[in-house]
């Protein structure tokens, strides 16, 4: 199932120019390579910088590592990744710049999605209209939390803005050439593994989300697909690898 999903994620999307950067895969391209002994001889790097946030999740990670080793994989442990600190300045903040990119792209993509809806009334709407609707119906739409992310995104300009382009180039270099690519090359790896995310957390209407740890950001910022398979459960909540 994960191989089929990865094939779709990495496949061609005519609405997404980024998918033109590589040859298109069909949903069955990767499935053909899923074999019972597929891990034998593969070098798997354990990304420890994306683990160590939750003891019970870490225990499941160790069990998964033992299982892969028993299946013939060569485990390369102790892989660490740190963001580059000198792309544009000594205090370069990759995650801050990545959030800046996210806000630009969220506004652009949401407006494009709305414009493509078949309902003409909805197709005329924009992020600005959604913000105003929420303000007009705050009691129903925002009883607990506000819409700060919407408002931050609305303040951004088009994707032709120099600030967006510079931020995108910087974060992709940090996550690609100086991140995933470098780790794979330096350690001669076939793949990197880490816990996907912590177990689900309780809803907190005062403090909001309480997410701790996870490995999705590096793949998301780089633009590479991130594949998750079940690793186990913690207190009945699923966690992935």
Which residues are covered by each model-predicted region?
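Short helix-loop capping/hinge segments that flank enzyme active sites or metal/cofactor-binding pockets
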Residues: 27-49, 100-176, 181, 230-238
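Acidic/polar loop patches that form or flank catalytic/metal-binding clefts of enzymes
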Residues: 3, 13-20, 73-80, 120-128, ...
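Glycine-rich, small-residue loops and helix-cap segments
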Residues: 3, 7, 67, 148-241
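A short helix-breaking turn/cap at a secondary-structure junction
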Residues: 1-60, 82, 136
């Amino acid at each position: 199932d994960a191989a089929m999903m990865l094939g779709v994620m990495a496949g061609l999307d005519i609405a997404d120019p980024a998918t033109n950067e590589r040859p298109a895969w069909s949903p069955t391209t990767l499935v053909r390579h899923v074999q019972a002994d597929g891990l034998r001889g593969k070098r798997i790097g354990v990304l420890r910088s994306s683990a160590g946030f939750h003891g019970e999740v870490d225990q499941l990670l160790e069990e998964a590592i033992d299982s892969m080793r028993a299946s013939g994989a060569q485990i390369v442990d102790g892989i660490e990744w740190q963001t580059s600190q000198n792309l544009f300045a000594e205090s370069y903040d990759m995650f801050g710049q990545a959030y800046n990119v996210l806000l630009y792209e969220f506004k652009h993509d949401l407006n494009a999605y709305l414009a493509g809806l078949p309902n003409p009334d909805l197709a005329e709407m924009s992020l600005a209209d959604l913000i105003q609707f929420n303000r007009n119906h705050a009691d129903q739409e925002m009883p607990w939390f506000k819409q700060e992310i919407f408002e931050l995104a609305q303040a951004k300009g088009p994707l032709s803005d120099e600030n967006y382009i510079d931020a995108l180039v910087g974060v992709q270099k940090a996550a690609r050439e100086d991140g995933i690519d470098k780790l794979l090359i330096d350690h001669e790896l076939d793949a990197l593994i880490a816990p996907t995310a912590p177990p689900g957390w309780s809803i907190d209407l005062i403090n909001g989300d309480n997410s701790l740890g996870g490995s999705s950001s590096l793949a998301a910022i780089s633009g590479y697909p991130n594949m998750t398979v079940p690793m186990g459960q913690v207190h009945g909540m699923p966690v992935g690898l």
